[in-house]
């Protein structure tokens, strides 16, 4: 864990006046048992360009809660409908310094992956990772990634040619700890 994370608490994060976001960690029964839905963001001029992420995004006042934000964004980005999903609960919040975001992840489940409708401006494609792979950590190893601070060596999940790092990897790490 980066040393600056040791000193982060909710009060310290709040003093940075972060943008708030909610993400949906969707689990479904797939070919290899429980799988986690992820998406690839398109390449654009921004901090999270081309990264693997969970469906989710920035809080809007009409959302009222970050859980509602997660559901709204998941519908807008990949077509997941709240009424087709069983809410499981929330994971730990996290702070993303490069983009100054405070993020709350919410876990949902469905017996099968609902039909997805991708918003092309926000999603290049989706992929899923079997929970067994995440839990046995066989796909975790360091990766060199480019950040706004320059190149950095970080722990990452490697799956189907993709490098899953940053906040997404941290959330997957917590999910792994809960299911192991």
Name each model feature, range by range:
Residues 118-154, 158-160:
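NUDIX/MutT-family hydrolases
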Residues 1-53, 58-114, 145, 150-180:
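N-terminal leader/linker segments that precede catalytic domains of diphosphate-processing enzymes
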